[in-house]
């Protein structure tokens, strides 16, 4: 069986040019032009994705089999092309009969070429002309087949792109904003068969998230919690240190008190009086020599730099790699209602952070069993829809969830992940062995565990094992206070 790609190769048909023309026609279609005008970011994303679509179409051409009649005619053409003139003339009647029997598009032209020859025999030039016209007929048939297949692929691809563009246009304000990188990752998540009603569930929770801005801020703070930290440097050299020092100046500026000196110009009146008494004159001169006369002290102040060298402890910032999110969501009955909506909206907010920062987001629902969804996989939107469709009506088995998290963190791909537990933490006490294992991961592997507490009534003993506790109380009083502060 000959593939369409092989037949095109034998007939020197350039399929790459055909595919390139199809793509250019597709991009110029009015349906896509409307989307590109409304969402310009998606045009760049789609352009980036074009090589993959071209490769898929070329692969489709390679895997498409040639119709049996066309394959048989091509094999007959190859057979007659290799014949000598005598053998060609000998087999010509059988060939004409075969073309007529197969209703070949070349039959009419072949009969006309031979009808012009009275002897029903061909010379060398007529043989060459016959084979050229036959090859041209085969080429036209192959081009027609290629075009039919490409038209079918174009319609299929156009329908797929329209669906994905419509979905991305609806979800971009919820999960990507105007971030082109996030929009590109969102585009990658939209593969799969989804109807409009399916992804409207994400839009609804996106609207709810917009009405609870504190949830989005909490997710962003949690995502930024692994910032670069200052680390002291041990090999810091000594540096020159400048310190301003104030010292008295000899320049007279103001009276600053009394002192003993030999300054005649600033003598106090009692000292001058002793000079006029003959009995005390010798005492005056003795005190003058000893600089013990009471005088006014006039002085100012001056500042200068005191330069010293001392060792300075330098610090450099050690960037902390931001790994994936592993989010454990409590689906017990106490997490139903408003708590359930907040939990799902918070997971969407974390997905938004993950798309913007090129991180993975893995959701684990824990009740009586653990159910997992990876929202950043190739079918992430489909998995997100299945997650949002879940109902929180189970029990609380936090220990089983943490066991599953520890197993996931042991995987090399998830070694740098941040584990986030979303619950009201109204649960049974954790086993001591599990607490020890969590502590070991925190201390030896430097892995971080976050608790998002959705109630003020959670058990403190359970939450002590977490590195960070983020509180979002969903009680009526807290909801009213948050609404009043907006």
Swiss-Prot record:
Function: Component of the RavA-ViaA chaperone complex, which may act on the membrane to optimize the function of some of the respiratory chains. ViaA stimulates the ATPase activity of RavA.
Classification lineage: Bacteria, Pseudomonadati, Pseudomonadota, Gammaproteobacteria, Enterobacterales
Family recorded in the similarity comment: Belongs to the ViaA family.
Protein origin, superkingdom: Bacteria
Locations listed in the record: Cytoplasm
Protein name: Regulatory protein ViaA
A Gene Ontology cellular-component term: cytosol
Record has Chaperone as a keyword: yes
Coiled-coil parts of chain: none
Database matches in InterPro entries: Uncharacterised_ViaA, VWF_A, vWFA_dom_sf
Record key words, sorted: Chaperone, Cytoplasm
Main location: cytoplasm
Gene name of the encoded protein: viaA
Quaternary assembly: Homodimer. Interacts with RavA.
PANTHER family given in the database record: PROTEIN VIAA
